[in-house]
Amino acid sequence: TIIASSRKFSNATFEEIGHLAHEIVSLAETCCAEGADPSCYDAGSSALSAKSCGKESPFPAHPGTAGCCAQEGLEQKLCLAALRHPPQQPPRYRQPPGGELCQAFEKDPKDFADRFLHEYASSYSQAPLPVLLGSTRTFLSTVSTCCISPAPNACFLKEKLERRTLSLLTLISNRFCSCFAAQGKDKATFSYLAALAQKAPGASFEELSPLAEDAAEAFSRCCDSEAEDCMQKELSEHTAKACGALSARDGRVADCCDGQNPIQNYFCLLALPPAPAPELPEAQKPTNEQACSEEGARHATRYLFELARRHTSVPDALLGKLYEASQKVREECCPAGDPSACLDGK
């Protein structure tokens, strides 16, 4: 409950999350008990909503709360349930030194665990729940093991190396699921394609576009999945495809793909800086007819891809603005009485 509440309200304090988690657990224990009144949950959730709307509410603050509280009944409950904070950018959690960890753990193991779950889940709120559960579970196991070890620092170092894959999986999935949630599937696919174009500008649109679409499909399947191995399995398969398609083209990619661990290989690919821009002829803009055809979106994406591979140092944010602008222009002009005049004017 602490993890779920902290993911949902990533900017809330530990105390606010504690109040919310306590109320949710109490409601579940009362209403799921044998012989509980059938109206128990409805009455309990109504009381919880009323408490959320009170002036002295102990729950996480949200700018949308007042709007929800202006509604009544089921609409109010659904509105409050849908509220969530934006993800932390970048994640704020930093692991303290082993000595500090053990001191806090030995003082109060339960409080230590609860505070860690809150801080970690708040920082990586967009990582899939199974990934977060696995990562937090192994870390708490590490603390309980290493704090009774005769050599705690050596123990923490050894365990950190063993947890590296899971830590990277949490970092990667949080980053891409945040992007996916904020941008939507189409723009996230383009962002991924543009990043590939800048890392491997020698590769063509036909080579890189399927990789971007494959990544988008993987994240669309796994970001909200409760399957335990979804993200690791999909990311490993995607890494194999990327390595197979690009290793022969780029020595840097080949070096990243040389390892035995697909998740670490993928992180290496992710960390590659943009390559020098190749000497290429000027990119051809889509014609007005192409822009408004059934394949108009693909023509626009291809043109922006060509810009990205010719200008490998242009930041993702600017390419994203160009993508949004091209979409807006097509939406405005293609249904117009004279699309060509509209497009030329834009």
Language model features by range: what are they?
Residues T1-K346:
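General marker for long, soluble alpha-helical cores
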